Amino acid sequence: MGPAGGLTVSGDGLAFDLITMGRIGVDLYPLTTGVPLEEADTFGKFLGGSPANVAVAAARLGRRVALISRTGADPFGAYLRSELRGFGVDGRWVAEVADHPTPITFCEIFPPDRFPLYFYRLPKAPDLEIAAEELDLGAIREARVFWMTGTGLSEEPSRAATLAALEARTSPGTTVFDLDWRPMLWREKPGPYYERALALATVAVGNTEECAIATGESEPYAAARALLAAGVELAVVKRGPEGVLAVHRDGTVAEVPPVPVQVVNGLGAGDAFGGALCHGLLAGWDLATVVRYANAAGAIVASRLACASAMPFSDEVEEVVGRAGGL
């Protein structure tokens, strides 16, 4: 059937474990840490964009994953599709947009906690050109987990497409809203769009700043309660050096401390956390186990330079979990 029709399976006839939707781009990082961009002269080129990284993270853990996004019709776009294939992520819904170049993101790396980002997404990023009528809503409906982001709500037609995808999630399954607040990418107040998405999602994930944007609450427990009141079943609040708080509507609470690690680049840690969170939810683990596992995955990536290529395999995560006291 057509793009919005009934193709609900992956290549071997099974529904996807996870479909992510939203940003993809090229990350260019200085190969020397602690150096400002004006002094850096060697850079590494990596696949980037939070939904793309989350997809890679889950694929590394053995999950059947696809990404919905757009690139420019340029060599960087070809590079990204090649990288997705190499990482085991199905890129059938990563199409080219002729009129917009593939986005580039530069980063400065000042461990342990300063990693300024510089987005080059003008005049408009291709991933914001995803249109509702282009979506394979059948596949989105059948995926065991669907992951979308706040940036996808920032501009049309991506906004309408993201909401259409959320509304298609009528079958049992997990729908994750990554709050993903990037103020430089918004021209409007996000409140009404975040409110609509929270009413349609089952899980919300964000750091304390993102939770405050979504709910008006910055205290972690208050933010979690506000997210639950907005409609989700599970609220996950990332608290940086204080660890992670997860609260389920059924009253289950998991408060997990951080995994000690020597930070090299913290930018991919949240995406590794997200992919591992999806993996744990798919596995049916209890909430504390899911969060401990996701925390370990995030810590591993924080100790490495890159994002996508730094995503850990399951044996690496299990080793870190074991050192931290086990699941």
Model regions and ranges:
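Glycine-rich phosphate/adenosyl-contacting loop at the front of the ribokinase-like
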Residues: M1-D90, D113, Q262, L327
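A short, aliphatic-rich alpha-helical micro-motif
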Residues: G13, L137-R141, A197-A199
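Conserved beta-alpha-beta core of the PfkB/ribokinase-like small-molecule kinase fold
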Residues: V145-A226, L234, E242-V244
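Short beta-strand scaffold segments in enzyme catalytic cores
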Residues: V56, I104-E108, G243-A246
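Conserved phosphate-binding/catalytic region of the ribokinase-like
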Residues: M1-I19, G216-L327
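Conserved N-terminal subdomain of the carbohydrate kinase-like
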Residues: R64-M148, E319-L327
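Hydrophobic anchor at the start of a short beta-strand
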Residues: R64-V65, G91, G173-T175, A235
